[in-house]
């Protein structure tokens, strides 16, 4: 049982190293490198239940020929794994990591979604700009109307201020008169207060 796990671990390490080599130099990734590295692992493979060496070699050689050059989608790769149900888990993990390195091609649906989002955001920005411009223009007209309505009233407003000042003057004169009356009343009672004033 331990030898099966060791074999799986070796396959996982081999797959990881091959994946790194493929990502660093994809042009040098070929079937020769795959068969050379897999032949070194073949010496250590025990006779255990599962796929034979020829099946796994066929499986990996098909993988090395398809991954870097053909750019097939992940659906075609997963179709291969459904045919080979008895393949070992390191091969499966290598396939999933190889599939994750291939970027998905944009479909027309995603392109349309992005375009629709762009158009909607552009319209929203235009609406906000129009609202700001309308509010600025309306505030300017209101300010002009207020200035125009104040301009004819300026002589009248000075008249209002004069009438206000005369009203204030009347209040002061009333206050002075009442103070005189108080002083006169006090002076009648007290002759020295009259001399002070």
Curated annotation (Swiss-Prot):
GO cellular component, one term: cytosol
Physiological role: Regulates endothelial chemotaxis and tube formation. Has a role in angiogenesis and apoptosis via modulation of the actin cytoskeleton and facilitation of proteasomal degradation of the apoptosis inhibitors BIRC3/IAP1 and BIRC2/IAP2.
Annotated GO biological process: angiogenesis; apoptotic process; cell differentiation; chemotaxis; negative regulation of angiogenesis; positive regulation of endothelial cell apoptotic process; positive regulation of proteasomal protein catabolic process
Descriptive protein name: Endothelial cell-specific chemotaxis regulator
Composition skew (Polar residues), residue ranges: 50-63, 83-107, 155-168, 178-189
The organism's taxonomic lineage, starting at the top: Eukaryota, Metazoa, Chordata, Craniata, Vertebrata
TM region(s), chain numbering: 114-134
Signal peptide as annotated in the record: 1-23
Annotated keywords: Angiogenesis, Apoptosis, Cell membrane, Chemotaxis, Cytoplasm, Developmental protein, Differentiation, Glycoprotein, Membrane, Phosphoprotein, Signal, Transmembrane, Transmembrane helix
Name of the gene this protein is made from: ECSCR
Membrane topology, from the record: Single-pass type I membrane protein
Cytoplasmic side: 135-197
Annotated region described as Disordered, given as residue ranges: 40-107, 146-172, 178-197
Domain of life of the native organism: Eukaryota
PTM remark: May be heavily O-glycosylated.
Protein family membership: Belongs to the ECSCR family.
Residues on Extracellular side: 24-113
Broad class of the protein's primary localization: membrane
Residue ranges, compositional bias (Low complexity): 64-82
Subunit comment: Interacts with FLNA. Interacts with the 20S proteasome subunit PSMA7.
Localization, UniProt: Cell membrane; Cytoplasm
Pfam families with a match to the protein in the record: ECSCR
Modification sites for Phosphoserine: 187
InterPro entries named among the record's database cross-references: ECSCR
């Amino acid at each position: 049982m331990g030898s099966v796990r060791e074999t799986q671990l070796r396959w996982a390490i081999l797959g990881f190293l091959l994946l790194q080599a493929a990502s660093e130099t994809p042009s040098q990734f070929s079937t020769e490198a795959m068969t050379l590295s897999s032949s070194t692992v073949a010496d250590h493979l025990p006779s255990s239940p599962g796929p034979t060496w020829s099946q796994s070699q066929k499986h990996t050689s098909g993988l090395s020929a398809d991954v870097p050059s053909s750019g097939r989608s992940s659906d075609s790769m997963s179709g291969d794994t459904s045919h080979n149900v008895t393949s070992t888990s390191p091969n499966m993990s290598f396939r999933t990591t190889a599939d994750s390195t291939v970027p998905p091609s944009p479909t027309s649906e995603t392109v349309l979604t992005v375009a629709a989002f762009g158009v909607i955001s552009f319209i929203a920005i235009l609406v906000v700009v129009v609202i700001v411009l309308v509010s600025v223009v309306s505030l300017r007209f209101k300010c002009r109307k207020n200035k125009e309505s104040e301009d004819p009233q300026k002589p009248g407003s000075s008249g209002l201020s004069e009438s206000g000042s005369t009203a204030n003057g009347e209040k002061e004169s009333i206050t002075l008169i009442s103070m005189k009356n108080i002083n006169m009343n006090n002076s009648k009672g007290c002759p020295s207060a009259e001399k002070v004033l």
